[in-house]
Amino acid sequence: KPNDFFWIIEGKLAVSECIGGGGLTARKIRREEEIQWLKSQGINSIFSLLDSDFNLKNYQEVGFRTYHFPLGENVSVESVDVIFEAIKEALSDKERKLLIHREYLDEEVPGILAGYLIYSKLLDDPIFARTILERILGKPLSPKAIALIPTL
């Protein structure tokens, strides 16, 4: 399975680092093994937050639906809102099981996931959304991540 793989919404929304590893650690064999593992878990769509379109064509060739929303260095509220809406739209299909990934599970990704839980109205308490993500990931969210969670 990919490094740092976690279900955020069991059987529906997951997160991990880049399939096959990121940067210099990426390996084709590892990527192929992780793709097979993801398929065995029912994942059928990849939502990439990578700056480049790295591997999107490969994902499409093996049957994944792909989404690409490059997340730059300075994440704006506007770009996060676009990402929240895109995730919501992707998950509106009951058959879709979505994996969100970036090169590494960095500071922004947990904030985006907690923020999505609020944005989509699955949760209505930003502090509870933060707590849920901290429990799932087994680590506290950074101030940078917390800043991405919408307040009501």
Feature map (PLM): residue ranges:
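Glycine-rich nucleophile elbow surrounding the catalytic serine of serine-hydrolase chemistry
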Residues: D106-I112
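Cys-dependent protein tyrosine phosphatase-like superfamily
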Residues: K1-L99, I112-L152
